[in-house]
């Protein structure tokens, strides 16, 4: 297991994030025998999957959803769900013993004479290179549109969606043709008056 960085130590790489992208980067950094550290804002392993809606499921089987080095364990039926993915990421992280500090919120990255300094509220770290693997879940993009201030109903992003029961019997418009939009629409259409809007013809439904 790689040891944590000491105060003032110059690392080869600092990775900001702790989800699957960060873990994949860490795998190859470890193989290259570089000194590195992951700084994760989450309380525990799993990245954005820890915040996914309850029925969130991958669109691909375990064998096609693995990250480098260690295959995702198979599921008994269907495709992996949220909890299975979180468990896999927890086991993956422990398997390789990556050095991770959490929870830590990064406030700035700045250049120094030696390389780059990564700042948090309580501590600084230094490295020759910094990789951002923070994803987009914590800052979802809610598009602006004319008349948005006139809408009196509820508007949320898929990042805030949790359970379909909150929309039972309501009129719901799901906007977006990606996997999230397709999966949420399929679930809501069973209990709500749901309509799905996409910019182009969707290829398939879950």
Per-region residue spans from a language model:
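Feature captures the FAD/FMN-dependent oxidoreductase FAD-binding
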Residues: 79-138
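A Rossmann-like FAD-binding core segment of flavoenzymes
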Residues: 104, 108, 189-206
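Short beta-strand "acidic-cap" motif of Rossmann-like dinucleotide-binding folds
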Residues: 34-41, 193-198
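N-terminal Rossmann-like FAD-binding beta1-loop-alpha1 element of flavoenzymes
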Residues: 8-38, 181-189
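Conserved Rossmann-like nucleotide-cofactor binding loop
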Residues: 21, 44, 180, 202
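Glycine-rich dinucleotide-binding loop and its adjacent helix/turn
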Residues: 75, 81-84, 134-194
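Glycine-rich active-site loop/strand segments that organize a redox cofactor
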Residues: 47-87, 196-206
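Short, Lys/Arg-enriched N-terminal segments with co-localized hydrophobic residues
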Residues: 1-3
